[in-house]
Amino acid sequence: MEQFRGTTILSVRRNGKVVIGGDGQVSMGSTIMKANARKVRRLYNGKVIAGFAGGTADAFTLFERFESKLEKHSGNLTRAAVELAKDWRTDRILRRLEALLTVADSKASLIITGLGDVIEPEQSLMAIGSGGSFAQAAAKALLENTKLSARKIVEKALTIAADICIYTNQNFTIEELDSES
């Protein structure tokens, strides 16, 4: 069976805000199956925002697992991410899941992979998915050359990615939190 694929998720931290945004397109092969999927969500009573790229069902399973890790570790984002990554890598069922997660709270931003990696990005910027490199390049240029807010940077960079990547559309979901950095 052909895999659902493609998306763009982007996170930017700037001026006391952290923002994660993503597009809404779900593709299967060369067919758009859905244009308004919600790939960015609030977790842990709204204190954490998360986005996913990869298989939709896989991502929902990982969101549930991650939220239970947040509950278990009293909202400690890094600890919950490391515990999820360990489970994801070692559990026979979980390790078959194909997705990447971006997660952020007021203090940290992380990418979690099925290989057991928990990556803290440089320069307050992270992007995943088929259009991630386009969005990241656009956001980096906007961060370095404008005074735009984190939200505006995410909106503009996702728009640029959607203009380039065939697996990304302009139906965005954007979530924002106050940040300590």
Swiss-Prot record:
Residues involved in Na(+) binding = A162, C165, T168
Annotated signal peptide = none
InterPro entries assigned to the protein according to its UniProt record, in alphabetical order? ATP-dep_Prtase_HsIV_su, Ntn_hydrolases_N, Proteasome_sua/b, Proteasome_suB-type
Query: Where are the catalytic residues?
Result: T7
Alphabetically sorted, this entry's keywords are: Allosteric enzyme, Cytoplasm, Hydrolase, Metal-binding, Protease, Sodium, Threonine protease
Q: Which reaction is catalysed here?
A: ATP-dependent cleavage of peptide bonds with broad specificity
Q: Which residues cross the membrane?
A: none
- Class in the EC hierarchy, top level: hydrolase
List localization entries: Cytoplasm
Database matches in PROSITE patterns: PROTEASOME_BETA_2
Q: Explain what switches its activity on or off, per the activity regulation comment.
A: Allosterically activated by HslU binding.
- Spell out the GO cellular component terms annotated for this protein, sorted alphabetically and separated by semicolons: HslUV protease complex; proteasome core complex
Question: Domain of life here?
Answer: Bacteria
GO function terms (MF aspect): metal ion binding; threonine-type endopeptidase activity
Q: What is its EC number?
A: 3.4.25.2
Give one GO biological process term. proteolysis involved in protein catabolic process
Main subcellular location of this protein, as a coarse class: cytoplasm
Gene3D superfamilies, per database record:
Glutamine Phosphoribosylpyrophosphate, subunit 1, domain 1 (3.60.20.10)
Q: Name one Pfam family in it.
A: Proteasome
Subunit structure, per the record?
A double ring-shaped homohexamer of HslV is capped on each side by a ring-shaped HslU homohexamer. The assembly of the HslU/HslV complex is dependent on binding of ATP.
Main function: Protease subunit of a proteasome-like degradation complex believed to be a general protein degrading machinery.
Family of the protein in this entry: Belongs to the peptidase T1B family. HslV subfamily.
What name has this protein been given in UniProt? ATP-dependent protease subunit HslV
The organism is Coxiella burnetii (strain Dugway 5J108-111)
